[in-house]
């Protein structure tokens, strides 16, 4: 399975053509702190229309001899700094976007919730002392609540629960906890630090829990040195780490900074020689992020392994 992170906020919908041409199996709508209530409503309405149209798709598929294709639509639910009541409300709202798909044994669209802690600045300032004492809710809380709500019928039983993992910083115990809490698919951060990430993937693949889940390795579309540095910061790793310096040295040189072809090849090589070589990987999660990255996506993915 290959999924793609969709653009949201005032960029919502601007990636429709690129998404359609690249033949992704799933689309992930992030829950970002910069996306206010109005923009979040726009995302929800878009998803609602998408899944409601699935009924028409199924009717057409039923009359066709061609096998029906299934797309996974994933709505992210981030705890950020919300209290338990508001987090539960988000789970309920997001989960019920997929109500019209339930029950359906052969949907052309499946729904999933990606359960994450969130990364806004206010949360980051509290996380050094995170836990029950300061009341911050995390991805395990969301997974646990969503699982129970699904069991009680408060959200559709067909909704899958997804989680995230960072192979450069997370413990294997974190993976186990999330699987035990109900996660059945993981999206990882890019394995920029190859050996550190390889160790995490190999250890995870050897666990009993890995038998029950899909692991989609994160693939960015790097467009410049500055863009790579943004990603390293996002992944919570030091710019001065030996692995970070090694990775930066592999980028196209300054003379090629605006050479699109050189960056297309860099990204394709990262997929072939790093991301897709990790143990236990069952697919990829592509994250274009920028307009330039989006433009590269179709060409990079054309020859990428699936």
Q: Where would I find each of the regions flagged by the language model?
A:
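Short, well-ordered coil/turn segments that N-cap beta-strands
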Residues: 23-26, 67-73, 109-111, 155-161, ...
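Catalytic beta/alpha-barrel core
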Residues: 5, 26-38, 75-78, 113-117, ...
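Non-catalytic positions within long, well-ordered alpha-helices that form the structural scaffold/packing
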Residues: 20, 92-108, 179-180, 277
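Catalytic domains of carbohydrate-active enzymes, especially glycoside hydrolases
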Residues: 15-33, 178-181
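Active-site-adjacent beta->alpha loops and helix N-cap segments on the catalytic face
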Residues: 35-50, 81-87, 120-148, 170-172, ...
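Catalytic cores of alpha/beta
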Residues: 83-97, 170-177, 225-231, 292-299
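Active-site pocket-lining/capping segments in soluble small-molecule metabolic enzymes
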Residues: 1-21, 114-156, 160-168, 207-276, ...
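Aromatic-anchored, glycine/proline-accented short structural segments
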Residues: 173-229
């Amino acid at each position: 399975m290959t999924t793609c992170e969709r653009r949201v906020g005032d960029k919502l919908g601007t990636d429709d053509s690129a998404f359609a041409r690249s033949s992704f199996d799933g689309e992930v709508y992030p829950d970002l702190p910069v996306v206010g209530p109005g923009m979040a409503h726009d995302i929800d309405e878009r998803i609602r229309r998408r899944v409601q149209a699935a009924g028409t798709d199924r009717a057409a598929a039923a009359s066709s001899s061609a096998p029906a294709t299934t797309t996974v639509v994933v709505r992210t639910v981030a705890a950020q700094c919300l209290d338990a009541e508001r987090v539960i409300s988000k789970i309920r709202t997001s989960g019920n976007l997929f109500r019209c798909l339930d029950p359906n044994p052969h949907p052309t669209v499946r729904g999933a919730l990606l359960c994450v802690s969130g990364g806004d600045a206010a949360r980051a300032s509290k996380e050094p002392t995170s836990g029950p004492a300061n009341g911050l809710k995390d991805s395990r809380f969301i997974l646990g609540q969503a699982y129970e709500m699904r069991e009680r019928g408060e959200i559709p039983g067909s909704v899958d629960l997804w989680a995230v993992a960072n192979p450069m910083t997370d413990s294997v115990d974190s993976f186990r906890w999330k699987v035990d809490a109900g996660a059945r698919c993981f999206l990882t951060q890019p394995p920029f630090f190859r050996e550190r990430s390889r160790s995490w993937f190999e250890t995870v693949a050897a666990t009993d829990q890995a038998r029950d889940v899909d692991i989609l390795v994160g693939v960015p579309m790097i467009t410049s040195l500055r863009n790579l540095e943004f990603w390293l910061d996002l992944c919570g790793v030091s710019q001065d780490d030996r692995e970070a310096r090694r990775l930066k040295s592999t980028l196209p040189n300054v003379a090629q900074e605006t050479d699109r072809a050189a960056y297309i090849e860099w990204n394709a090589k990262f997929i072939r020689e790093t991301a897709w070589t990790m143990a236990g990987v069952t697919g990829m999660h592509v994250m274009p992020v920028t307009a330039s990255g989006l433009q590269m996506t179709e060409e990079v993915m054309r020859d990428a392994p699936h």
